[in-house]
Amino acid sequence: MDKVISFIQPSRNNLKYLKWSYNSIRKNLGYRHEICWADDFSNDGTWEWMMETAKKDRNIRVMRNEGPERLGHTILYDKLVDIATNDIIMIYHADMYACPNMDVEVLKHLQRGKVVSATRIEPPLHPDGPEKILKDFGIEPEEFDEQRLLKFVREFTKAKNGRDITNGIFAPWAMYKDDFLAIGGHDPLYAPQSKEDSDIFNRFVLAGYDLIQTWRGFVYHMTCRGSRFKDGALRNPAGQVFMKGRESDEWLKQNLRSTRNFIRKWGHMVQHDRYMKPVIPPKYDVGFVVKNCNTNMLKELEPWCSDIYGDWLGHKGYGLNKYIEEEQKDTQFDISKKIHSDRVKPKNDVVLQFDANKLTSQNFQLLVNLSDMLQDSGEVGEMEYDIFKFYIKSLDTYEKELIVCER
């Protein structure tokens, strides 16, 4: 096997998982693959350990964010790809254990124009799904049952399980570096993290890359040991596992920001099939002309359209300016250019007219699913449905304009 990988592995204050992950790569895959680490302004000794390890292991490259703010893996993945010296990169979480032959099985399928994922084995901290194996071999490195895991992997790969590959994607995933760079890598819109993976997966599909998951190469994934569940996991007296506390405030706030930005960019929520292959509705140019739109309703509606038109006179104008000022801090989209007076004639391909006072949780779902609805039954012309009046002059779509991210 002459192909070699550059493992792309940022880390932030999760040193014990990073050590565990590093040891598995070197023990089970050897020293032939490069490991690229980035310390994201940690205060738990991560940088010192990285530097010391790099002195002993010459196939490691390290870099550091000096702070004072975190950059997040959205940015650091791409910075590490830039310094990687191999033709093949693998996006790899710091809480993943590489099982023997994982690299061989991934590389067996890898060609240019393909993105290949290993299969995750995870403890039951999240709902089960057909794209992974839910089996408990430990929730912390201290209790990790390595020998039982390795026995399970040997038996699983020997058995006829009905599939060698499926079509989908989740970390760890590998591809040629030049394919990654051709679409501009991750979009910094989502920095420091959350939804950057769903965004780039959409762009892989739109660029024509094949998404392959091998069911003969495995990692054991502790899951979410960064900012989301920063305090780790526990067992209750019955042995069931759960995360300590709840998702961190930092993660919850950033996930909301990234979700709103994903909707602004794509016009819909994240969608995928049961094997995690992206489902990508068309992107339309949509304008909302909204009667009785106050600031609270503006916050709900603005991400779902290209432009929004309303009556912003008087106190509404003050609220509008406040909304733009606050929301602009959380996005690279120019919010001020999206919001217009209702005296301005809408310029969008698809225009929806409605009264915000008549919106309910039920009919709001039409806006959430608008891309699917227009794809299935949209026609040029005028129509009415529920509280909405449609004025459709074109059903051109723009999702392919989102493939390349200019860095």
Describe the residue ranges of each PLM region:
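A recurrent flexible, glycine/aromatic-enriched loop bordering the glycosyltransferase active site
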Residues: 75, 153-178
